């Protein structure tokens, strides 16, 4: 049974609606605003625009190609540039202040934050419990930022040491830090360092528990009380317990396709459930508590990108290589609607070839279309196209900030 999380209804009300709306009252204005940030595939550049008024746009130079993350409650967009050994930050120009029965919204122009991070191949970014954590795959450490300070333009990281550099992640949970752990096995050339599993540490990097086996650990997400990570054997779940981190491995069941694993996970904010990839043409809905832990969704074509809808926690979307966007019902674990939204983009070729990416913006899904030089606006209601926004170059990775609030 999927567990609903407190605050889901409020979240849905907060995020519902798209574009920009105002409702005048004697004392306040209700404002809904979404701002879209798009990274170019070929040149170091991020383009930002307001969804309902795309002529309100800004351009930010970057060192290299970016992966974009909305962090610090949407006040900041992190631009992770793995190949350029750099992480830059952009203040989104949108911030929220919670007042219990409502939240205030402040809107201004986006602006680059002067401070940036540099280090050997930053890759996975994890945000949880007010912390933003970046793993340096070739550095043997992670850097930890305070989300509130980052929203104020301060990037002053602390460092979490790892025993060996590897492609992994670090995340806070309870009073400890969870870190992937690599083997000390010698590797040749560009071969990846084997990853053994997940372990709890204190802030100085001292072990605070035993290693939980999760061979080839990759991908992480939070939902409710749990963190989940993909493994060769199954999906490892972790929650904070009275005596430290509590681990449970959910083995892949025999009735799932064999020879493939989960390596990318998304966590719902309104119900305690995860959506993960399962091979190139499948998804799994994962319940960390109740059986069946896995429910498999076969896709008609290979997956290009997928996302969860924060306003409708039981809903997800997946784009497949034929150019179709599919709505996923997580409660039923099935595709409930589909529509063609782009030309086909084959998954053959390099993993980083220019292909569409999707993100949620209230009652719209925004889809980058690199070959067309567009961001497409797709209605969640019926998957119809509401409009397109031209973006110079090859629009690729995407992040959205914003929502609804009150101005006084």
UniProtKB/Swiss-Prot annotation:
InterPro entries: AztD-like (IPR047697), Quino_amine_DH_bsu (IPR011044). A motif (N-terminal Zn(2+)-binding motif) lies at residues 23-29. Disulfide bonds join 214-231. Changing residue 99 to A: Loss of zinc binding to site 2 and loss of zinc transfer to AztC. This is Zinc chaperone AztD. It is found in: Periplasm. The lineage of its organism: Bacteria, Pseudomonadati, Pseudomonadota, Alphaproteobacteria, Rhodobacterales. GO terms for cellular component: periplasmic space. Induction: Up-regulated upon zinc starvation. SUPFAM superfamilies: YVTN repeat-like/Quinoprotein amine dehydrogenase. Changing residue 218 to A: Loss of zinc binding to site 1 and no effect on zinc transfer to AztC. The keyword Ribonucleoprotein does not apply. Zn(2+) 2 binds at residues 99, 102, 104, 408. Disruption phenotype: No effect on growth and no effect on zinc cellular level in zinc repleted media. In zinc limited media, growth is reduced in a znuA mutant background and also in an aztC mutant background. In zinc depleted media, zinc cellular levels are reduced and levels are further reduced in a znuA mutant background, an aztC mutant background or a znuA and aztC mutant background. The gene is aztD. Residues 1-21 form the signal peptide. Zn(2+) 1 binds at residues 124, 167, 218. It comes from the Bacteria. The keyword Chaperone applies. Changing residue 124 to A: Loss of zinc binding to site 1 and no effect on zinc transfer to AztC. It comes from Paracoccus denitrificans (strain Pd 1222).
């Amino acid at each position: 049974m999927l567990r609903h999380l407190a605050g889901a209804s409020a979240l849905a009300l907060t995020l519902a609606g798209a574009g920009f709306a105002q409702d005048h009252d004697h004392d306040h204005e209700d404002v809904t605003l979404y701002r879209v940030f798009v990274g170019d595939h070929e040149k170091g550049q991020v383009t930002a625009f307001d969804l309902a008024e795309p002529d309100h746009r800004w351009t930010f130079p970057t060192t290299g190609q970016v992966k974009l993350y909305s962090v610090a409650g949407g006040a900041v967009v992190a631009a992770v540039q793995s190949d350029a050994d750099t992480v830059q930050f952009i203040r989104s120009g949108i911030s929220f202040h919670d007042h219990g029965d409502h939240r205030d919204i402040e809107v201004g122009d986006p602006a680059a934050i002067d401070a940036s991070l540099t280090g050997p191949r930053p890759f996975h970014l994890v945000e949880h419990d007010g912390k933003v954590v970046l793993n340096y795959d070739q550095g043997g450490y992670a850097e930890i930022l305070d989300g509130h300070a980052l929203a104020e333009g301060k990037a002053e990281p602390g460092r979490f040491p790892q025993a060996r550099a590897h492609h992994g992640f670090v995340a806070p949970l309870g009073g400890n830090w969870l870190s992937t752990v690599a083997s000390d096995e010698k590797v040749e050339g560009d071969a990846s360092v084997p990853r053994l599993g997940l372990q709890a540490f204190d802030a100085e990097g001292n072990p605070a528990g035993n290693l939980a086996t999760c061979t080839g650990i990759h991908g992480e997400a939070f939902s409710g009380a749990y963190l989940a990570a993909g493994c060769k054997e199954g999906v490892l779940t972790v929650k904070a317990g009275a005596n430290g981190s509590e681990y449970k491995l959910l083995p892949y069941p025999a009735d799932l396709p064999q020879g493939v694993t989960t390596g990318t996970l998304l966590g719902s904010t309104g119900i305690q459930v995860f959506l993960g990839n399962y091979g190139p043409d499948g998804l799994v809905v994962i319940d960390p508590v109740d059986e069946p832990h896995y429910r498999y969704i076969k896709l008609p074509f290979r997956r290009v990108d997928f996302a969860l809808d924060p306003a409708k926690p039981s809903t997800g979307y997946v784009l497949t290589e034929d150019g179709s966007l599919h709505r996923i019902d997580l409660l039923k674990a099935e595709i409930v609607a589909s529509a063609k939204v782009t030309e086909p983009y084959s998954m053959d070729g390099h993993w980083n070839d220019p292909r569409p990416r999707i993100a949620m913006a209230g009652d719209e899904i925004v889809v980058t279309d690199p070959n067309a030089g567009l961001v497409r606006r797709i209605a969640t209601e019926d998957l119809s196209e509401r409009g397109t926004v031209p973006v110079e170059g090859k629009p690729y990775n995407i992040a959205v900030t914003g929502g609804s609030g009150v101005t006084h």
